Regions:
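Interface amphipathic segments
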Residues: 1-219
Length: 219
């Protein structure tokens, strides 16, 4: 569930296009399941089920939101026993049915156990920063990752560092580039993966260059 303190004002009602929100969240405690319930109350997309994520983890949340409902600046920080994260973004078209909800912002994590969140033992503590632009039409979101910098990522038992990436993900294709300058792994990968919804045929186009790889050190 969720519990905490929310303070704020809303002006401009009943004119939704001119309605402004100014709110702060302090010492808010929630689980992933509670976050899904909370988001469901504010979006037009119906019930959002996040119960399969971060099972058994409670997050402490502080944040703020300010602006028009369809152009809102939001900041949030999360702290938990599995790491922390901060995000700052502009949310657009929240109440316009003819347009997909949009997000344009930045995300930072510190020692965040991604494996605990998504339910896998392959990846764990991760420290990164990235810019993200996303649209959420019906079906699959369209996501653009700008200047992802991974300072540290525990992946399959090895602690990687020095990773940079950019990419775009949509329902039909992924196109991205990854550069790794880890002490035990130096490589460049650039590739496109496209899936035809009509024929279920996949198209792979990629380029890879491995300068150095110490497999013994990484296993």
């Amino acid at each position: 569930g969720y519990s905490g303190t929310v303070n704020g004002t809303m002006t401009g009602l009943p004119d939704i296009d001119r309605t402004r929100l100014d709110a702060t969240v302090k010492d808010f405690q929630l689980t992933a399941e509670g976050l899904g319930l909370f988001v469901s109350e504010w979006t037009r997309e119906g019930k959002v089920d996040l119960s399969r994520f971060a099972k058994g983890t409670t997050f402490m949340v502080d944040g703020s939101a300010e602006g028009l409902l369809n152009s809102m600046n939001a900041k949030i920080s999360l702290n938990s026993l599995i790491g922390s994260a901060e995000a700052e973004a502009v949310l657009t078209d929240i109440t316009i049915p003819s347009k997909p909800i949009g997000i344009d912002g930045t995300i930072n994590t510190k020692d965040l156990d991604l494996g605990r969140i998504i339910g896998t033992d392959i990846i764990h503590q991760t420290t990164l920063r990235t810019g993200v632009k996303a649209k959420f039409p019906e079906g699959f979101p369209e996501v653009a990752i700008d200047s992802l910098i991974v300072e540290q990522m525990m992946l399959n038992g090895y602690d990687y560092s020095g990773i940079a990436a950019v990419g775009k993900l949509s329902e039909k294709a992924f196109d991205g580039r990854i550069i790794c300058n880890d002490p035990n792994l130096n490589f460049l990968f650039q590739g496109t993966f496209a899936l035809s919804t009509k024929t279920n045929n996949a198209l792979y186009q990629f380029y890879a260059n491995i300068g150095h790889a110490d497999l013994q050190a990484m296993n």
